[in-house]
Amino acid sequence: MNLNATLVAQMVVFFILWWVVAKFIWPPLVKALDERAKKIADGLAAADKGKAELELANKRVEQALTEARTEGAQRIADAEKRAQMTADEIKQNAQAEAARIVAQAKAEAEQQAVRVRESLRDQVAVLAVKGAEQILKREVNAQVHADLLTQLKAEL
């Protein structure tokens, strides 16, 4: 057995195997590894980009929520202010209307009092004329005059 011939034969087989692997197996394997590394790198970049976009979107959402809260609070304050102004206006209108009604009622009461006074004057005048007629129709007598005046007082 020749050790050198075996060694040379093994070296020839090794180099043929190395050449086959280097020519046919290694390039697709390296290409697959490179593609996988590129996909991983692209995935990491996309994840970083997505994370950045998510943070930006979260900031925008937070800003929009803050603006919405501020706008909502402002609208509530404006609505409360308008409601208060409306309530004050209604109150003022009601007070003015009440004052007008009271003034009108006072005027009507005064007119009615004037009418009642005029009516009483007319009645007193009629009674005075009647009393004078009765006094003049009868003879002049103090007792009769006193009785007639008492009778007139009762009628009044």
UniProtKB/Swiss-Prot annotation:
Q: Which cysteines are joined by disulfide bonds?
A: none
In the UniProt record, does the keyword Metal-binding occur? no
- Key words, A-Z: ATP synthesis, Cell inner membrane, Cell membrane, CF(0), Hydrogen ion transport, Ion transport, Membrane, Transmembrane, Transmembrane helix, Transport
Q: How does it sit in the membrane?
A: Single-pass membrane protein
GO CC: one term? proton-transporting ATP synthase complex
Keyword match Membrane: yes
Q: Where in the cell is it found?
A: Cell inner membrane
Q: Which PANTHER family match?
A: ATP SYNTHASE SUBUNIT B, ATP SYNTHASE SUBUNIT B', CHLOROPLASTIC
The entry's family comment says: Belongs to the ATPase B chain family.
Oligomeric state and partners?
Answer: F-type ATPases have 2 components, F(1) - the catalytic core - and F(0) - the membrane proton channel. F(1) has five subunits: alpha(3), beta(3), gamma(1), delta(1), epsilon(1). F(0) has three main subunits: a(1), b(2) and c(10-14). The alpha and beta chains form an alternating ring which encloses part of the gamma chain. F(1) is attached to F(0) by a central stalk formed by the gamma and epsilon chains, while a peripheral stalk is formed by the delta and b chains.
> Function of this protein?
F(1)F(0) ATP synthase produces ATP from ADP in the presence of a proton or sodium gradient. F-type ATPases consist of two structural domains, F(1) containing the extramembraneous catalytic core and F(0) containing the membrane proton channel, linked together by a central stalk and a peripheral stalk. During catalysis, ATP synthesis in the catalytic domain of F(1) is coupled via a rotary mechanism of the central stalk subunits to proton translocation.
This one is known as ATP synthase subunit b 1
Species source reads Ralstonia nicotianae (strain ATCC BAA-1114 / GMI1000) (Ralstonia solanacearum)
Q: What is the lineage of its organism?
A: Bacteria, Pseudomonadati, Pseudomonadota, Betaproteobacteria, Burkholderiales
